From Swiss-Prot:
Residues 301-373 are annotated as: Disordered. GO terms for cellular component: extracellular region; membrane. This is Nephronectin. Residues 52-87, 89-128, 132-168, 169-213, 214-254 form the EGF-like domain. Keywords: Calcium, Cell adhesion, Developmental protein, Differentiation, Disulfide bond, EGF-like domain, Extracellular matrix, Repeat, Secreted, Signal. It comes from Pongo abelii. Residues 420-563 form the MAM domain. It is found in: Secreted, Extracellular space, Extracellular matrix. GO terms for biological process: cell adhesion; cell differentiation.
Amino acid sequence: MDFLLALVLVSSLYLQAAAEFDGRWPRQIVSSIGLCRYGGRIDCCWGWARQSWGQCQPVCQPRCKHGECIGPNKCKCHPGYAGKTCNQDLNECGLKPRPCKHRCMNTYGSYKCYCLNGYMLMPDGSCSSALTCSMANCQYGCDVVKGQIRCQCPSPGLQLAPDGRTCVDVDECATGRASCPRFRQCVNTFGSYICKCHKGFNLMYIGGKYQCHDIDECSLGQYQCSSFARCYNIHGSYKCKCKEGYQGDGLTCVYIPKVMIEPSGPIHVPKGNGTILKGDRGHNNWIPDVGSTWWPPKTPYIPPIITNRPTSKPTTRPTPKPTPIPTPPPPPPLPTELRTPLPPTTPERPTPRLTSIAPAAGTPPGGITVDNRVQTDPQKLRGDVFIPRQPSNDLFEIFEIERGVSADDEAKDDPGILVHSCNFDHGLCGWIREKDNDLHWEPIRDPAGGQYLTVSAAKAPGGKAARLVLPLGRLMHSGDLCLSFRHKVTGLHSGTLQVFVRKHGAHGAALWGRNGGHGWRQTQITLRGADIKSVIFKGEKRRGHTGEIGLDDVSLKKGHCSEER
């Protein structure tokens, strides 16, 4: 009996544990897609989300641009598109077998077939021999409309030239055919156009669509303000403002010098107009306001010149205390007078008066006058504030004045004129990675700071290559160019790095190459000849090669290189 009770107890515990274990492992229900059983509960599987109508739909992050989401992070692209998120155009003309027997032109999301000269495009897409088209000698084939031969162009962005046989590009940006969203500018291409973000904006995927987002140059450090200025981000750009105590345009800020003169004490000036002269004895040329108080600079005391009036000799003290001098108002018109602080006198003694030499009514006759004319002193500046000079007549011992450097001086310092420069820290700077290559140039973080480009690892067994192209375009120069760059080809069987230039059609033989070595090296190459259309860096790697190919600090200058290395 005890054995049976123990067996029943063990069986119940086992069934309970089995039920709990089954609840921890979700199992998908075969009859429903996206539904899983979590023990006794049924819910959407991982990577699926329940919609408002109750069904479970797969979730793809980021979203499929030209396709539909059929599973967790799995897109099914529409015809003509490829990529993980269906955001890349599929080049159908490069597929094998080719979709067209004669000429094939890839378009965005599709392709078009064209016939060779002497053939006509039929409604089913095939090419049929047509003697009339061979005689027309059209660039992209022809079509017969109502018995008339007409050459055709493969894209709406192309139109027939005046000769009626060739096709020329239509500038959609200039003609107004293009319509770009806000914050994007139109850039014409051959046969089409693209909408590119304005300078100061980056194309980002926000809110389920691509938008041009403002770049905060201040937080990223991509500004050229003075070290004595602050950077303020604005929409699409930034501005620089000098800090307090500095002045300038923000790109260049100069310190504002502060000049202070120690006052000696207040002297009350009585009401009325007066003139205090500046001459060889150090007086200030200053006209006070009515009833104002003036703080003169420290100057030695000069005793006044006494007139011949019968006055007593004043009693002076070594350090006189400035006191207000009461003066009765004289009869008009008043002469220009010079008043100086006098030592205190006894009440019964009259105050000595100093009268100027200016001839005016009311001047007492027989008085000894003082010349109040402004003396010519070319070695001293005039004004309310004076900057004291040193004995050598030099101001630069007091203030630090920054000497400006003109553009001509900089051109003399650097005789090679820069055409292009890129360190790949903030992008490719106009360099283009060819998408048709098996390998690609990828940016990688440099332990010393910044970024450099490296060739991705090969996955296929055959020989693979990655090309990096700089189209010169408007930078094209009629003379020689100096190409300078840093590079490394390290490791066992690392591969090969080569430099090419393209002038007309395909590029020629390699101008330079490296297939081994240790560490970074600096190389300069003179690109000789005119009409260089593009510069190409080619990196080749094979599967299983463990080495690394690196490229950084590429620049182009006009003229010959100072030394080839």
